[in-house]
């Protein structure tokens, strides 16, 4: 099974280890993943089993050589894990991850490449919208889709963490006023239904 593991700063609950695997649920329980507490022994077991080049893949997923398809698959599975959906993504092998900010950034070319990938996943506002507003709108739309599909609102903190994970690689984390903007967009979108 192909598997890549990206280490974040440490193993405390405030920091995360990001996993990409065929089915991470077979390695760790959902509760452990969602709490962000991955014990050192579990990681050692995982690494000794997989025997994969961790450093090389960490560089790849830090923004170097990131293809459009990889970006789409990554975003789909981040949402899959955050919203705790039971269905498996049909677009690729499951890549499941938990995450937190880490300060990695990429250059402008990679930001644009990744942004265009994410935008293909959602119906967007007219082209007059700014890039920032488009990203926020995409987050709001995904939240509304989840509400309609599962009959409950997703945890906004998880939505924000998903966005912040992407932004630590491709830009800057969401500001407080932008978080509120996403919430207001969700309310407006729900009223239109």
UniProtKB/Swiss-Prot annotation:
Its main location: host cell. The keyword Transmembrane helix does not apply. GO terms for cellular component: host cell cytoplasm; host cell nucleus; virion component. Signal peptide: none annotated. Induction: Expressed in the early phase of the viral replicative cycle. It is found in: Host cytoplasm; Host nucleus; Virion. The keyword Phosphoprotein applies. Oligomer. Interacts with host HNRNPK. Belongs to the asfivirus phosphoprotein p30 family. This is Phosphoprotein p30. It comes from African swine fever virus (isolate Pig/Kenya/KEN-50/1950) (ASFV).
């Amino acid at each position: 099974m192909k598997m890549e593991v990206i280490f974040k700063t440490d193993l405390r609950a405030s920091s995360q280890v990001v996993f990409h695997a065929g089915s991470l649920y077979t390695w760790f329980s959902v509760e452990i993943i969602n709490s962000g507490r991955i014990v050192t022994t579990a990681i050692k077991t995982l690494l000794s089993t997989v025997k994969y080049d961790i450093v090389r893949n960490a560089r790849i997923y830090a923004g170097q050589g990131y293809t459009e398809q990889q970006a789409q698959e990554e975003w789909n599975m981040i949402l899959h894990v955050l919203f705790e959906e039971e269905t498996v993504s049909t677009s690729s092998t499951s890549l499941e991850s938990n995450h937190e900010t880490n300060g990695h950034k990429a250059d402008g070319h990679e930001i644009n490449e990744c942004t265009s990938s994410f935008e293909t996943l959602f119906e967007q506002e007219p082209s007059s919208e700014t890039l920032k507003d488009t990203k926020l709108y995409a987050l709001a739309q995904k939240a509304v889709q989840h509400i309609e599909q599962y009959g409950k609102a997703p945890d906004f903190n998880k939505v924000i963490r998903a966005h912040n994970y992407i932004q630590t690689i491709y830009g800057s984390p969401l500001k407080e006023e932008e978080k509120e903007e996403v919430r207001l967009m969700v309310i407006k979108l729900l009223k239109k239904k």
